[in-house]
Design a protein with these regions (language model features):
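A short, structured active-site edge motif that brings together acidic residues
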Residues: 92-105
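Beta/alpha (TIM)-barrel catalytic core signal, keyed to glycine-rich beta->alpha loops juxtaposed to Asp/Glu
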Residues: 3-8, 142-298
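Residues at the N-termini of beta-strands
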Residues: 23, 64, 133-136, 166, ...
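Short, acidic/polar
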Residues: 43-57, 112-130, 173-178
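N-terminal binding-site loop/beta-alpha segment at the start of enzyme catalytic domains
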Residues: 1-93
Length: 298
C-alpha cells in the first residue's frame, strides 16, 4: 500500500491515563544496534540514521515512544538517542519506559531488580532522557520476582512522589494484572502478541479492553523472530492478504493487531526510514472480517 502522506493519526487515538496518544507508536529497542537486540556483542547501529528515524517518526505523527535504559549496544543507548533527537520534547510526546530487568555496562544481564532498586532504575531513565518525570513506567515481570505487588508498590510510591505519571505492567498474566491493580491503577499491559497467538492471549486482549486498559503488543511484526526481527518464513494467509491489499506482510500484521480493539496500541521498531513510513501507513489499512478471521481473530 502507498505510504505517502499517511500519518500515525490514521490509526486513531487512545488515552493512557490522561495522556492521549496515536495508536501507532514507535519502539526504540532496535535503534542502538544492527541485527539482534539485547545481546552483549551487538553491532552498534548508525547514530545519525537512528536520530533521523526518530525525528521522522515525530514528523509522521508518532507521539508514543517505547524505550528502556537496558536498550543499548556498545556505543549506543536508545534513551540517549531519543534525548538527542527529540529534546526539547514536543508537548504531546509520551515516552514509555520499562524497569525490572537490568544489564551491566558490558551488556550482560543482571538479576532482576529488587523493589528497593527500582528507584535507581527510574532515576537512570530520567537522567538519560533528560526528564524530571516519566510519563509511563512499565514493570517488566521477571521469573525471579516472588511478589509483583511488592515491586509495583515501590513504583506506586515513586508515582506518588511525582517521578512517574502513570504505571503499566509487562509480561504478565491476567492474575498478575489483577495483583498489580490491587496496588495502583494500571494504564497499559505490554505483552508479546500477534498473528498466531494462543486463545488465552486473545482472551487477555479482550479482557484488557473491557477494563479500559491499553494492550501494547511487542514483537507484533517479528512473529517467531522475536529480538532478531522478522524471519524469512511467513504465514501463508498473511502473504495472501498482503497481496490482495498491495501491502507488505508486516503491514498486514500491524493492521490485524490494531483491529483487535480500539485499546490496542502498536509500537513497531525499526532503524530504517522506509520501514518506518510503511509501519505508520499500516494504521490506515483496514482488513475485512473474513480476512481477520483467516488470520486468527476468534
Amino acid at each position: 500500500m502507498a505510504s505517502a502522506q499517511i500519518t500515525a493519526a490514521a490509526a486513531g487515538t487512545w488515552t493512557l491515563g490522561d495522556l492521549t496518544v496515536n495508536r501507532m507508536g514507535f519502539g526504540a529497542m532496535r535503534l542502538p544496534q544492527t541485527g539482534r537486540a539485547l545481546i552483549a556483542d551487538a553491532t552498534p547501529g548508525d547514530r545519525d540514521r537512528a536520530i533521523a528515524v526518530l525525528r521522522r517518526a515525530v514528523e509522521l505523527g508518532v507521539n508514543h515512544v517505547d524505550t528502556a535504559a537496558f536498550y543499548f549496544s556498545p556505543l549506543r543507548s536508545a534513551n540517549e538517542l531519543i534525548n538527542t533527537a527529540l529534546a526539547p520534547y514536543p508537548d504531546d510526546l509520551v515516552i514509555v519506559t520499562k524497569v525490572g530487568p537490568g544489564r551491566d555496562p558490558w551488556g550482560e544481564w543482571l538479576p532482576a531488580a529488587r523493589p528497593d532498586q527500582l528507584r535507581g532504575q527510574v532515576e537512570e531513565n530520567l537522567r538519560q532522557l533528560g526528564r524530571d518525570h516519566l510519563d509511563v513506567v512499565n514493570l517488566r515481570r521477571m521469573p525471579s520476582m516472588e511478589s509483583l505487588a511488592e515491586h509495583f508498590g515501590a513504583l506506586a510510591e515513586l508515582r506518588d512522589a511525582g517521578l512517574i505519571r502513570h504505571l503499566g505492567v509487562s509480561g504478565v498474566s491476567p492474575e498478575q494484572l489483577a495483583e498489580a491493580q490491587a496496588v495502583a491503577p494500571v494504564v497499559c499491559v505490554q505483552n508479546r502478541y500477534g498473528v498466531g497467538a494462543s486463545p488465552e492471549a486473545h482472551a487477555f486482549v479482550d479482557a484488557c479492553g473491557k477494563q479500559g486498559v491499553a494492550f501494547v503488543p511487542f514483537f507484533a511484526i517479528a512473529g517467531q523472530g522475536g529480538g532478531a526481527g522478522a524471519t524469512g518464513a511467513e504465514h501463508p494467509e498473511v502473504l495472501t492478504v498482503a497481496r490482495d491489499h498491495g501491502a507488505t506482510a508486516a503491514q498486514v500484521r500491524l493492521a490485524w493487531t490494531l483491529q483487535r480493539g480500539p485499546h490496542v496500541l502498536a509500537i513497531p521498531g525499526t532503524g530504517d526510514p522506509g520501514h518506518l513510513a510503511d509501519n505508520v501507513a499500516a494504521g490506515a489499512l483496514r482488513l475485512s472480517p473474513d480476512e481477520l478471521a483467516r488470520l486468527g481473530v476468534p
